[in-house]
Amino acid sequence: MQVIDLPLDRAGEALVAAWCRDRRLEVLAERWHCRWGELDLVTQEDSALRFIEVKTRRQTGWDQSGLLAIGPAKQRCLSRAAACYLASLGNQAAVACRFDVALVRYRSEPSAAAVKVAAWGQGYLELWCYLPDAFSAVESGW
């Protein structure tokens, strides 16, 4: 089992990046920054790019394990950051793209339903929900 020694938010991103690599996705960028914000992960599968927003939460949370934190305003910021990322690629920017969401939670014991698990602190981080095509740039108003 993988052991992650990073702050909670970065540990969740590292877990999802490892899961992507396990699935043979190429991780192009981690924590990519521009004036509009940060892209947690940018991966590539064949010729398509995935912009993956990772939400990591402790066992209990007010926002449905991070899902409510990705509202319309956050989606607009992610869409704009993705546009900046694509612009940085130059001529290669005409590729298929999608926005995925990965939900990671901290638990004292891993659950059988977890997609990927890693030891963290005195417990475990688990990728328990992965939402492909969670939203589109058009839906976010960009």
Swiss-Prot record:
InterPro entries per record: Restrct_endonuc-II-like (IPR011335), tRNA_endonuc-like_dom_sf (IPR011856), UPF0102_YraN-like (IPR003509)
GO molecular function: nucleic acid binding
Entry superkingdom: Bacteria
Family: Belongs to the UPF0102 family.
Protein name: UPF0102 protein Synpcc7942_0312
Species this chain originates from: Synechococcus elongatus (strain ATCC 33912 / PCC 7942 / FACHB-805)
